[in-house]
């Protein structure tokens, strides 16, 4: 088979797959999928330094001895020359099944690189890490080499990693040499005895029979045909398998009961329908299914638990009462002016009007809170129980791709990321349906080797978790549990196993911590060797001439002695953070379809895993290409690169993204989220958001890091409308919702009461039928049927990616096991094995993560994560809700995920600053909720409007925090007198606020302390970070000044002496100035007010009490901030004293200048000292 202008000939020898490249005629990486051709594999040569270099045009010319009389045209003609070798008895193609298996073995051991103006290379990794890789799925796993002289290929291995040797003498031979030996007489090259089995498939063993019928004509199905075959209807599959159905085998394997089709068993619906019986016809049988399966009562996967009316009704009533009281109070304030201090009255009224609007925007979306519950037993019964459509009981759950993002190993410790990866690999979800993608946006070798170490340690950790039901499955968190680890453990070998795994984990931590030094020493050694070689070559070339010092860029070297294609420790051209090639490494290749049980400890393994499935999910390292001149779009761009590469490699219909410091705390969390997606009506759910829970927070939660009011009050309330907002991590997405498609059966909402009081549906039958037939729809198209020809303009020109879209849509549908399930799929459709990885697939994945792929497409505009905001998560969720998708809030009994949060005051303020800046950007962009479509409900629109408007409250909040001080300084108050009407309004507003807080605590489950901490930090953040966010947002909108933020540093868990050491570190930032000024001004004002009242001729105690009360209210909210300034030992930083002194002097001078003291010598009236 000849290549399409790839500059080389394709070879059948599997050992040559390690030297392959995917290139076009111009040497540039081709646009993927062009013309529907699969990427071709061509040769590359290996240099003396171990690097693989493709055969460019110059290389080919030099290889052929290009002379001066050879024209460029002749060189180009040679490049496009094709040779097709016909099949002969000595040149027979390898069996497709065996060839695919051989190729997958090499693909999983190869590091793929490529991108802009470069070919896609696959570099065989003989060694990925310094330590030995033992698991057969892992890249660089130990394998034997072929014993034939001159052959560098690896011996075929089985699923356990053991060598497959065709002769009893155990002579090691690869697949190609074995085929040559059979052709040349069939004798073993080692012992010279004839082979007993001369067919390679007899040696390797045939693969399990697929559950789908073979392709017509007996021809092997192509990759796309196999992937599309699952979309056949269940009726067609049942008819095609009628003759091959073995009832006895099914009864034996599923432990069923004899009855269906039995002479004693009555025929189903024989009277009514004339069908039924053993053939399964009629309604009772349900398309050939036994009635004992279809007669089961249908059970939902999820339930909506409404808030008790005894709590919700008073809560709604109080909201209405407080709304009315606020309106009356504001009207009274406007009518009754303070003529003595109009400036004070005017500022207070404006602030109170804004606070009333802000409270209304925050409170209205809380009218419809709900709770939800899942039933995992029903999920297992529907998707993993043997049925006629799934006789072997294979998992019928859809595939799930997990995205883990990291960018800087210095601020995000590799050990934290590795523990997150281990918790994902050990999750309780079908191994063959789970894939994990790690996005390293920094392209660091440290992250790469840390992930390889994690994959190696997973060989022991994951089976250990499955064997003993370990929770949590993050080793760092598990071994640091404060509770008894042996509680409820009944296996006699648990103590021995735990001790062994703990020792292995300690060694694993040491290896991770030593990686930076190991990489540095290795790079120094290889760099010294290269310098010596360069100097030697220079001396040989210069002879007696003066030799200048050789300067070679100091590269970063991998464990196998080759250059790292990503970012070097000392950045160089094409090896810097913003300039490096795309990299993909399959750390753990896709597992086999059937369970693979381990061996006993006597057979050489450290632990006894004889009854444990030792397979591991697929793990892929991805670092997208970055080049100068291309906008990388930060985290959103990295996520979109993962969406495209995962669509090509595994195409899971669902995606779950996690930050590198958020690990899986509940091993069944994936199943909990899948319950919502697979339930009736689940095809309209765009994403399932899990709450964020944090570890390492100080017991008092000084800075409201747990954020329970938002996650347990606001998010539960939004779940009763259209669903919660997307908060950036711990979210399960439907892939086609990320692709920008509309949900099925979407409708428009016109009224403001449709959220809590839905109107009767009036939908035309023809419209429903049309939407059921139309699986994929986009808002940009008015045609009834989707115009597939427009897909390349939206998604790019990758045919692999475009062809995967309808497959992902079909696989993401719920089961059609109930008449109420719309747009469902037949049971058993997802029990087919996944395709093996081949070189063209990974080469295509390299192409879709290149820097130029998104040019002239809608990625980041309407497709995938949305660009243009530092809070891309909120914007992405808003776009889905705006298209009509719903979201669900999944609160599990055991926390689904846990992560870390910055407990340092400065880090916390910068985190809030980033969130608030993103909200300001949203308000001034096209994503403003005022411009939302009619597919978004009214209260959902109010919630998103509040997201964009809340930072502006800081302007009025700061003014209002100074009003008590101004009142005390001036001797005036916001009202003329503290009369009964004002005090009554104030009392009612305060009481209703407290009662609402109590009821929120009642239905949300938070504590009063958490509610109060949230109130305190609302004022701290509102007077510091929110104000800075408004200023930065206005600068970006008006002046076009871009805003850059640094990553929040994650704790590596090394502070064993003090877990909360960061809490007491005082790091100065300009964000602290406004709260410090507010505190100092109010303290000085209280002192001035007391002194004036005491020494005045006519003391006005009512105004003093009013001003002092509000000043103390402000200071009470700022108490955590003041405590944070004192550090560990209660020492206030010197800069605070300096600011306080300057502030006191400034205020005193200003006050003397504005209001000079009177000439009355009798200060203080009749009061005299004794």
Curated annotation (Swiss-Prot):
Signal peptide: none annotated. Residues 1-75, 269-295 are annotated as: Disordered. Residues 10-24 have a biased composition (Low complexity). It is an enzyme of class 2 (transferase). One of its GO terms (cellular component) is Golgi membrane. It holds the Pfam family zf-RING_4. The keyword Cell wall biogenesis/degradation applies. Its EC number is 2.4.1.-. Residues 527-551 form a coiled coil. The chain crosses the membrane at residues 311-331, 341-361, 955-975, 981-1001, 1027-1047, 1070-1090, 1104-1124, 1134-1154. This is Cellulose synthase-like protein D2. Its main location: Golgi. It is a multi-pass membrane protein. GO terms for biological process: cell wall organization; cellulose biosynthetic process; plant-type cell wall organization or biogenesis. The active site is at residues 441, 873. It is found in: Golgi apparatus membrane. Belongs to the glycosyltransferase 2 family. Plant cellulose synthase-like D subfamily. One of its GO terms (molecular function) is cellulose synthase (UDP-forming) activity. Thought to be a Golgi-localized beta-glycan synthase that polymerize the backbones of noncellulosic polysaccharides (hemicelluloses) of plant cell wall. Residues 273-288 have a biased composition (Gly residues). Keywords: Cell wall biogenesis/degradation, Coiled coil, Glycosyltransferase, Golgi apparatus, Membrane, Transferase, Transmembrane, Transmembrane helix. The keyword Coiled coil applies.
